[in-house]
Amino acid sequence: MIIKRDYYLKKIIDKRENGRIKIITGIRRCGKSYLLFNLYQEYLLSKGVKENQIISIALDEIDNLEYRNPFRLNEYIKEKTKNRNQIYYIFIDEIQLSVAVSNPYIDSKEENVTFVDVLLGLMKRSNLDIYVTGSNSKMLSSDVLTQFRDRGDEIHVNPLSFAEVYDLYENKELAFEHYNVYGGMPYIYSLKSDEEKAQYLKDLFKKTYIKDILERNNKIGRAHV
Protein backbone atom coordinates (compact mmCIF):
# COMPACT_ATOMS: atom_id res chain seq x y z
CA MET A 1 0.00 0.00 0.00
CA ILE A 2 1.41 3.36 -1.06
CA ILE A 3 0.30 6.35 0.98
CA LYS A 4 0.94 9.68 -0.67
CA ARG A 5 2.14 12.42 1.64
CA ASP A 6 2.58 15.15 -0.92
CA TYR A 7 2.28 18.04 1.53
CA TYR A 8 5.21 16.88 3.65
CA LEU A 9 7.22 15.58 0.70
CA LYS A 10 7.10 19.03 -0.88
CA LYS A 11 8.32 20.55 2.38
CA ILE A 12 11.39 18.32 2.32
CA ILE A 13 12.02 18.87 -1.38
CA ASP A 14 11.88 22.64 -0.89
CA LYS A 15 14.67 22.38 1.69
CA ARG A 16 16.92 20.10 -0.36
CA GLU A 17 20.60 21.08 -0.24
CA ASN A 18 19.91 24.30 1.66
CA GLY A 19 22.98 23.95 3.87
CA ARG A 20 20.95 23.21 6.99
CA ILE A 21 20.05 20.07 8.91
CA LYS A 22 16.53 18.86 8.16
CA ILE A 23 14.90 17.51 11.34
CA ILE A 24 11.72 15.53 10.75
CA THR A 25 9.74 15.32 13.99
CA GLY A 26 6.38 13.95 15.03
CA ILE A 27 4.77 11.45 17.34
CA ARG A 28 5.81 7.82 17.07
CA ARG A 29 4.38 5.82 14.17
CA CYS A 30 3.03 8.85 12.32
CA GLY A 31 5.03 8.04 9.17
CA LYS A 32 8.29 10.00 9.48
CA SER A 33 10.53 7.13 8.42
CA TYR A 34 8.27 6.20 5.50
CA LEU A 35 8.31 9.80 4.34
CA LEU A 36 12.10 10.01 4.36
CA PHE A 37 13.27 6.50 3.48
CA ASN A 38 10.57 5.68 0.95
CA LEU A 39 8.90 8.72 -0.55
CA TYR A 40 11.81 11.17 -0.47
CA GLN A 41 14.38 8.56 -1.42
CA GLU A 42 12.26 7.52 -4.41
CA TYR A 43 12.02 11.18 -5.40
CA LEU A 44 15.81 11.60 -5.29
CA LEU A 45 16.38 8.46 -7.34
CA SER A 46 13.85 9.68 -9.91
CA LYS A 47 15.90 12.89 -10.24
CA GLY A 48 19.10 11.02 -11.07
CA VAL A 49 20.64 10.63 -7.63
CA LYS A 50 22.51 7.32 -7.44
CA GLU A 51 21.89 4.82 -4.66
CA ASN A 52 25.47 5.12 -3.38
CA GLN A 53 24.88 8.82 -2.79
CA ILE A 54 22.23 8.06 -0.18
CA ILE A 55 23.67 6.98 3.18
CA SER A 56 20.93 5.54 5.39
CA ILE A 57 21.37 4.70 9.08
CA ALA A 58 18.50 3.44 11.25
CA LEU A 59 19.56 3.69 14.88
CA ASP A 60 16.74 1.41 16.03
CA GLU A 61 18.23 -1.56 14.16
CA ILE A 62 20.44 -3.94 16.10
CA ASP A 63 23.09 -3.93 13.36
CA ASN A 64 23.55 -0.20 13.91
CA LEU A 65 23.81 -0.09 17.69
CA GLU A 66 27.41 1.07 17.55
CA TYR A 67 26.36 4.21 15.67
CA ARG A 68 24.38 5.41 18.66
CA ASN A 69 27.81 6.50 19.85
CA PRO A 70 28.34 9.95 18.28
CA PHE A 71 32.02 9.29 17.57
CA ARG A 72 31.27 6.07 15.69
CA LEU A 73 28.45 7.77 13.80
CA ASN A 74 30.81 10.55 12.75
CA GLU A 75 33.47 8.07 11.62
CA TYR A 76 30.98 6.00 9.64
CA ILE A 77 29.54 8.95 7.74
CA LYS A 78 32.98 10.35 6.92
CA GLU A 79 34.11 6.93 5.71
CA LYS A 80 31.10 6.69 3.38
CA THR A 81 31.45 10.22 1.98
CA LYS A 82 35.12 10.53 1.07
CA ASN A 83 34.53 11.87 -2.43
CA ARG A 84 34.30 15.62 -1.82
CA ASN A 85 33.23 16.19 -5.44
CA GLN A 86 29.98 14.29 -4.99
CA ILE A 87 26.83 15.24 -3.11
CA TYR A 88 25.73 12.75 -0.46
CA TYR A 89 22.35 12.58 1.23
CA ILE A 90 22.59 11.46 4.86
CA PHE A 91 19.44 9.88 6.32
CA ILE A 92 19.50 9.06 10.05
CA ASP A 93 16.41 7.45 11.54
CA GLU A 94 15.48 7.68 15.25
CA ILE A 95 18.27 10.11 16.09
CA GLN A 96 16.98 10.41 19.66
CA LEU A 97 18.44 6.95 20.33
CA SER A 98 21.94 8.39 20.07
CA VAL A 99 23.60 8.66 23.48
CA ALA A 100 25.80 11.34 24.98
CA VAL A 101 29.38 10.17 25.58
CA SER A 102 32.26 11.59 27.55
CA ASN A 103 34.50 14.12 25.88
CA PRO A 104 37.95 12.45 25.88
CA TYR A 105 39.63 15.84 26.13
CA ILE A 106 37.51 17.55 28.78
CA ASP A 107 36.52 15.82 32.02
CA SER A 108 33.10 17.37 32.53
CA LYS A 109 29.56 16.09 32.01
CA GLU A 110 28.65 19.51 30.70
CA GLU A 111 31.06 18.88 27.82
CA ASN A 112 29.65 15.48 26.82
CA VAL A 113 29.55 14.86 23.08
CA THR A 114 26.12 14.33 21.49
CA PHE A 115 24.67 13.75 18.04
CA VAL A 116 24.08 17.50 17.80
CA ASP A 117 27.85 18.11 17.91
CA VAL A 118 28.36 15.53 15.18
CA LEU A 119 25.67 16.92 12.88
CA LEU A 120 26.75 20.53 13.34
CA GLY A 121 30.26 19.49 12.38
CA LEU A 122 29.19 17.47 9.35
CA MET A 123 26.91 20.20 8.02
CA LYS A 124 29.99 22.35 7.40
CA ARG A 125 30.92 20.00 4.59
CA SER A 126 29.33 21.44 1.46
CA ASN A 127 28.82 18.03 -0.16
CA LEU A 128 26.60 16.65 2.62
CA ASP A 129 22.84 17.13 2.81
CA ILE A 130 21.64 15.87 6.20
CA TYR A 131 18.21 14.62 7.25
CA VAL A 132 17.23 13.07 10.58
CA THR A 133 14.01 11.78 12.09
CA GLY A 134 13.22 11.98 15.77
CA SER A 135 10.30 11.24 18.03
CA ASN A 136 9.32 11.02 21.70
CA SER A 137 9.90 13.34 24.61
CA LYS A 138 13.51 14.09 23.68
CA MET A 139 12.60 15.71 20.38
CA LEU A 140 10.03 18.37 21.19
CA SER A 141 10.04 21.35 18.85
CA SER A 142 11.41 23.75 21.45
CA ASP A 143 14.28 21.37 22.23
CA VAL A 144 15.16 20.91 18.57
CA LEU A 145 15.36 24.62 17.87
CA THR A 146 17.50 25.18 20.96
CA GLN A 147 19.89 22.28 20.34
CA PHE A 148 20.65 23.10 16.73
CA ARG A 149 21.19 26.80 17.39
CA ASP A 150 19.18 27.96 14.42
CA ARG A 151 21.10 25.72 12.01
CA GLY A 152 18.30 23.23 11.52
CA ASP A 153 14.97 23.26 9.73
CA GLU A 154 12.21 21.35 11.48
CA ILE A 155 9.58 19.57 9.42
CA HIS A 156 6.84 18.44 11.80
CA VAL A 157 4.80 15.51 10.52
CA ASN A 158 1.28 14.75 11.71
CA PRO A 159 -0.67 11.49 11.33
CA LEU A 160 -2.67 11.03 8.15
CA SER A 161 -5.28 13.66 7.37
CA PHE A 162 -8.70 12.58 6.17
CA ALA A 163 -7.77 13.73 2.67
CA GLU A 164 -4.80 11.33 2.68
CA VAL A 165 -6.94 8.44 3.94
CA TYR A 166 -9.71 9.30 1.47
CA ASP A 167 -7.40 8.50 -1.44
CA LEU A 168 -6.87 4.96 -0.13
CA TYR A 169 -10.51 3.94 -0.48
CA GLU A 170 -12.75 3.26 -3.43
CA ASN A 171 -15.71 3.33 -1.05
CA LYS A 172 -15.54 6.93 0.19
CA GLU A 173 -18.22 6.44 2.85
CA LEU A 174 -16.15 3.63 4.32
CA ALA A 175 -13.12 5.93 4.31
CA PHE A 176 -14.94 8.43 6.50
CA GLU A 177 -16.26 5.72 8.81
CA HIS A 178 -12.83 4.16 9.35
CA TYR A 179 -11.08 7.49 9.79
CA ASN A 180 -13.71 8.62 12.28
CA VAL A 181 -13.20 5.47 14.35
CA TYR A 182 -9.47 4.75 13.99
CA GLY A 183 -7.87 8.07 13.16
CA GLY A 184 -4.78 8.67 11.07
CA MET A 185 -1.98 6.38 12.22
CA PRO A 186 -0.68 4.95 8.90
CA TYR A 187 -0.13 1.34 10.00
CA ILE A 188 -3.83 1.03 10.86
CA TYR A 189 -4.68 0.98 7.15
CA SER A 190 -2.61 -2.13 6.51
CA LEU A 191 -4.52 -4.14 9.14
CA LYS A 192 -7.55 -6.18 8.12
CA SER A 193 -9.76 -6.72 11.14
CA ASP A 194 -11.34 -4.24 13.53
CA GLU A 195 -9.87 -6.23 16.42
CA GLU A 196 -6.34 -5.83 15.09
CA LYS A 197 -6.81 -2.11 14.60
CA ALA A 198 -8.24 -1.58 18.07
CA GLN A 199 -5.46 -3.60 19.70
CA TYR A 200 -2.78 -1.73 17.77
CA LEU A 201 -4.08 1.64 18.94
CA LYS A 202 -4.43 0.41 22.51
CA ASP A 203 -0.85 -0.88 22.58
CA LEU A 204 0.47 2.25 20.92
CA PHE A 205 -1.18 4.46 23.50
CA LYS A 206 -0.24 2.40 26.55
CA LYS A 207 3.25 1.27 25.65
CA THR A 208 4.48 4.28 23.76
CA TYR A 209 2.75 7.57 24.33
CA ILE A 210 2.14 7.16 28.06
CA LYS A 211 5.83 6.31 28.55
CA ASP A 212 6.91 9.40 26.68
CA ILE A 213 4.59 11.66 28.65
CA LEU A 214 5.66 10.26 32.00
CA GLU A 215 9.36 10.29 31.17
CA ARG A 216 9.17 13.83 29.89
CA ASN A 217 7.72 14.95 33.19
CA ASN A 218 10.05 12.77 35.27
CA LYS A 219 7.19 10.98 36.96
CA ILE A 220 8.43 7.41 36.72
CA GLY A 221 11.10 5.39 34.99
CA ARG A 222 10.69 2.99 32.11
CA ALA A 223 10.72 -0.09 34.34
CA HIS A 224 7.60 1.00 36.19
CA VAL A 225 5.36 1.83 33.24
Where in the sequence are the language-model features?
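Pre-Walker A adenine-sensing motif
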Residues: I2-G19
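Hydrophobic anchor at the beta1->P-loop junction of P-loop NTPases
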Residues: I24
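P-loop (Walker A) phosphate-binding loop of NTP-binding proteins
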Residues: I27
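Conserved lysine of the Walker
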Residues: K32-S33
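Short glycine-rich substrate-engagement loop in P-loop NTPases that contacts/grips substrate
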Residues: I55-Q86
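Conserved Walker B catalytic segment
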Residues: F91, Q96-Y131
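Short regulatory helix/loop adjacent to the ATP-binding pocket of P-loop NTPases
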Residues: S137-D153, Y169-E170
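Interdomain hinge/linker elements that couple catalytic modules in large macromolecular machines
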Residues: H156-H224
